[in-house]
């Protein structure tokens, strides 16, 4: 029995030694290994969380910038359409002005041509009147062999011209 008791004591002593060794080892591991590992893991978790937050912020900023760019693009398209419309309106206005000016110039030319034609007609009539008067006087002088006085000559001319105007 004594051997068994010694064996139990040895077994109990070894167990106690192992337990104390384990506790010391656990304390050393806790102090030198577990804390730095958990701190490193916490830092890593914090960094990952920050990276995720940063990525989310970057994505939101990118979406905001994309929306702003789309809005600016829409605004620039509207501005371009407005500029084109203004240019079209200015072109139409200028075209209408040019047409009105051309029509006025054409009417002025037509009126001037009519005046010139009437003046030429009047000049031709006066010239013809003088020529006819001179020819009539010559013919009458030769036929009558006498000179007509101015009043007779004027009456003869007026009668002849009235006859010409009626035939026109």
UniProtKB/Swiss-Prot annotation:
User: What residue ranges are annotated as transmembrane?
Assistant: 10-30
- GO molecular function of the protein, one example? proton-transporting ATPase activity, rotational mechanism
- Assigned GO CC terms: plasma membrane; proton-transporting ATP synthase complex
The entry's family comment says: Belongs to the ATPase B chain family.
> What is the protein's given name?
ATP synthase subunit b
PANTHER family the record matches: ATP SYNTHASE SUBUNIT B, ATP SYNTHASE SUBUNIT B', CHLOROPLASTIC
Q: How does it assemble?
A: F-type ATPases have 2 components, F(1) - the catalytic core - and F(0) - the membrane proton channel. F(1) has five subunits: alpha(3), beta(3), gamma(1), delta(1), epsilon(1). F(0) has three main subunits: a(1), b(2) and c(10-14). The alpha and beta chains form an alternating ring which encloses part of the gamma chain. F(1) is attached to F(0) by a central stalk formed by the gamma and epsilon chains, while a peripheral stalk is formed by the delta and b chains.
Native source species: Limosilactobacillus fermentum (strain NBRC 3956 / LMG 18251) (Lactobacillus fermentum)
The UniProt entry, under InterPro entries, shows:
ATP_synth_B-like_membr_sf, ATP_synth_b/b'su_bac/chlpt, ATP_synth_F0_bsu_bac, ATP_synthase_B_chain
Q: Which gene encodes it?
A: atpF
The UniProt entry lists membrane topology as: Single-pass membrane protein
């Amino acid at each position: 029995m004594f051997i068994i008791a010694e064996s139990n004591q040895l077994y109990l002593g070894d167990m106690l030694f192992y337990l104390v060794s384990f506790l010391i080892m656990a304390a050393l591991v806790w102090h030198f290994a577990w804390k730095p590992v958990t701190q490193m893991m916490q830092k890593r978790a914090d960094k990952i969380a920050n990276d995720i937050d940063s990525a989310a912020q970057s994505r939101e900023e990118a979406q905001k910038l994309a929306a702003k760019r789309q809005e600016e693009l829409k605004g620039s398209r509207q501005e371009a359409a407005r500029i084109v419309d203004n240019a079209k309106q200015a072109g139409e206005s200028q075209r209408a002005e040019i047409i009105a000016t051309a029509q006025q110039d054409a009417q002025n030319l037509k009126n001037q041509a009519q005046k010139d034609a009437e003046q030429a007609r009047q000049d031709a009539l006066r010239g013809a009147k003088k020529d006819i008067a001179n020819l009539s006087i010559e013919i009458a002088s030769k036929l009558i062999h006498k000179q007509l006085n101015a009043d007779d000559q004027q009456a003869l001319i007026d009668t002849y011209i009235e006859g010409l105007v009626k035939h026109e």
